[in-house]
């Protein structure tokens, strides 16, 4: 890879981070029903169009195409791109948006890209923190979608994030509880996933000793 290609790759990585965080901010702000919701959706379109370009660019220049799809990070990008294309086709043919909940589900798929941030840092403590943050964040987004409008205690993203965090960390104050079966399942699987991750980390640490 020559100097020009390395510079382009670096620029792509920086833009990828910027657009990923745009999606994160967009989702959080959307839970407060802002008057600029349409603007957020337009910004999301720009971000996801960049992700689509980035995915095609990476796939085009990789030598081993089969190995490309064995990488979990590329699979995440593929899911995001396919979901975006399907949603765009639906909007084009129906001439109308499908609703904020569908848009937020698409945003959550994009949030899976947070997982890729772990590649940027080799510090194990920071990797563990980013992993936990990713689990809590995505679970919070799902909780907000299924519980908002049903659960009077969950009115915005912060309420959902607070509830998810204390549930996953098993603190569980009990001041906020899920009201829907979907919400309960999300918390159950999130806690089980978190605990299984702790067990795996402990097993690796013991083997290392």
From Swiss-Prot:
Pfam families: Ion_trans. One of its GO terms (cellular component) is voltage-gated potassium channel complex. SUPFAM superfamilies: Voltage-gated potassium channels. InterPro entries: Hyp-activated_K+_channel, Ion_trans_dom, VG_K_chnl, Volt_channel_dom_sf. Residues 32-38, 93-96, 147-181 are extracellular. A motif (Selectivity filter) lies at residues 170-175. It is a multi-pass membrane protein. The chain crosses the membrane at residues 11-31, 39-59, 72-92, 97-117, 126-146, 182-202. Keywords: Cell membrane, Ion channel, Ion transport, Membrane, Potassium, Potassium channel, Potassium transport, Transmembrane, Transmembrane helix, Transport, Voltage-gated channel. Residues 1-10, 60-71, 118-125, 203-209 are cytoplasmic. One of its GO terms (molecular function) is voltage-gated potassium channel activity. It is found in: Cell membrane. Homotetramer. The segment S4 is probably the voltage-sensor and is characterized by a series of positively charged amino acids. Belongs to the potassium channel family. NCBIfam families: K_channel_Meth. Inhibited by barium. Voltage-gated potassium-selective channel opened by hyperpolarization. This is Hyperpolarization-activated voltage-gated potassium channel.
């Amino acid at each position: 890879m020559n100097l020009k290609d390395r510079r382009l790759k670096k620029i792509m990585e920086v833009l990828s981070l910027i657009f990923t965080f745009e999606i994160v901010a967009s989702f959080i702000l959307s839970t407060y029903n802002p008057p600029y919701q349409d603007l957020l959706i337009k910004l999301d379109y720009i971000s996801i169009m960049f992700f689509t370009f980035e995915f095609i660019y990476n796939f085009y220049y990789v030598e081993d195409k089969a190995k490309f799809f064995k990488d979990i990070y590329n699979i995440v990008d593929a899911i995001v791109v396919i979901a975006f294309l399907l949603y765009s086709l639906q909007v084009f043919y129906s001439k109308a948006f499908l609703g904020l909940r569908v848009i937020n589900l698409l945003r959550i798929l994009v949030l899976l890209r947070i997982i890729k941030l772990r590649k940027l840092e080799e510090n194990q403590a920071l990797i563990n923190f980013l992993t936990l943050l990713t689990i809590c964040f995505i679970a919070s987004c799902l909780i907000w979608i299924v519980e908002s409008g049903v659960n009077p205690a969950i009115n915005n993203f912060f309420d959902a994030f607070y509830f998810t965090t204390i549930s996953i960390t098993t603190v569980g104050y009990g001041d906020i509880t899920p009201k829907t079966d979907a919400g309960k399942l999300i918390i159950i699987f999130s806690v089980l996933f978190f605990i299984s991750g702790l067990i795996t980390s402990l097993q690796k640490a013991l083997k290392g000793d």
